[in-house]
Amino acid sequence: MDRRSYIKHAGIAGVLAAGTAPAVYAQAAVRWRLSSSFPKALDTIFGAAETISKRVAAATGGKFTIQVFAAGEIVPGLQAMDAVKDGTVDCCHTAPYYYFGKDATFAFGCAIPFGMNARQQNAWMYHGGGMALMREFYARYNVIHFPAGNTGAQMGGWFRREIKTVADLKGLKFHVLQSRRREI
């Protein structure tokens, strides 16, 4: 291709590309509502949803905004995922262990006592097939699962004596969800 032909074709391509730009900017703004399972007082955890909201708005030039609501402002905190499933809100920020009562499989997507640490959980999720398994599971609830943080392993307890055998657990109190105490 000679120089004149190249310049001609490049010019035509430039005009066509410039003509399509207004169509992109003419798209309607997207506004979502996010229900959190956490109160504003838990600023580290609740703040994570606010940070995601700000980053999405910044990355899209304000064309996609997510309004974050604390637990109880739209639905009770433990019903955030149900609100997404039912179409009450567009998305939620929650912890899967709140939904053990629906299915114990939710345990694999979050921190639980004696479970994986943060690095192990992330490795499984992002490199060990965990994301695909969790998405398949969440599809049953009409929800798409996106991990958005990791609080690390949940402690089973702090004890005055060393735990060496199962018998050492007898009579100890644990920090675990009420609905799953009997299973541990």
Task: Enumerate the language-model features and the residues they cover.
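Short, polar/charged alpha-helical segment
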Residues: L42-Q67, G129, R181-I184
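Short helix-initiation/N-cap motifs at beta->coil->alpha
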Residues: F69-D82, E162, L177-R180
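Contiguous mixed-secondary-structure segments that line small-molecule binding/active-site clefts
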Residues: S53-K54, K85, A95-I184
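Extracytoplasmic "Venus flytrap"
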Residues: R33-E50, A71-V75
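Immediate post-signal peptide segment of exported/extracytoplasmic ligand-binding proteins
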Residues: A21-S37, E50, A57-T65, A139, ...
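Alpha-to-beta junction loops
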Residues: G62-F64, A80-T94, K173-F174
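N-terminal export signals
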Residues: S5-A26
